[in-house]
Amino acid sequence: MFGMKRLLTALLAAALLFSLAACGAAAADTAKEKPNTKPVVVTTLFPAYDFARTIAGERCEVSLLVPPGTEAHSFEPTPRDLLRIADCDLLVANGGESEEWLETMLDGIDGEVPVLYMLACVDPLEEEEKEGMQDLHEEEHEDEIEYDEHVWTSPRNAMAICRAICDELCTIDADGAAYYRQNCDGYCAELEGLDAAFREIVAQGRLGCLIFADRFPVRYFVEEYGLDYYAAFPGCADDAEPSARTVAFLIDRVREEKVPAVFTIEYSNEKMADVICEDTGCGKLLFHSCHTLSAGDLARGETYLSLMWANTESVREALG
């Protein structure tokens, strides 16, 4: 499955590089006509966008490459997107398998684009397949390591990423260093408060286990707070129908652990969760991974902090 995805990614990248070369001259002319005095920061995912815009404030132009509501794992960049990357002063990306297209793009761009990878800011964790999970990798090589890319789901990881973004901004705009560091310190203080709230909730909870009737993009979160978990699929696996065995396993766990509610993640069809809830009488809760927001979420002013604070209440309820 992943071999075919990589082939398609490479073909797409080659086509886009050709388009980039063709559009280069026109882009240069446009840049000359409309000079920009602010540093330009391009981000690939919402967490990076939210962190960067908070720290950069009014001193930088910060934009999000993956449009709101778009599934980041299936994002296909356009020639215009590539020009944005080529012309930016800093690119904040996630890294990892889902952004392999980006490496090919960067290799084909004349000059060097400063890139900060969120995965490089923390100690990455491998995806794991726990008991009861649907096996989606039967045809893959056993020695192929896949890292969980959702590093920001740990607030402490978010702090490390923010400090790294701040350092990069200070490098490309030394005159604004004091401003960036002040913004970063203030934001990290808010993240400290979020982290403290999660720790208190976990310490006071009756249970020490979360059950996801869905994909599982929050391994960094459960590792941070010492929680056990069960889930239907590892990481942000491709859409797949759960087996009867997987559903039955999760139903048994809900009953044995006396779990008050199971989790779904954003943009899930929730069918499996509905089956489990109907069979066991448990509730259903949302854990927003903050990976992708809808246009409506952005219009309402949702942020990483607002979504994660909403998650605190869900975790409190799920732990009993």
Language model segments and positions:
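Bacterial N-terminal signal peptides
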Residues: L11-S19
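Extracytoplasmic metal-acquisition and chelation regions
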Residues: C23-G320
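Bacterial N-terminal signal peptides that target proteins for export
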Residues: M1-L11
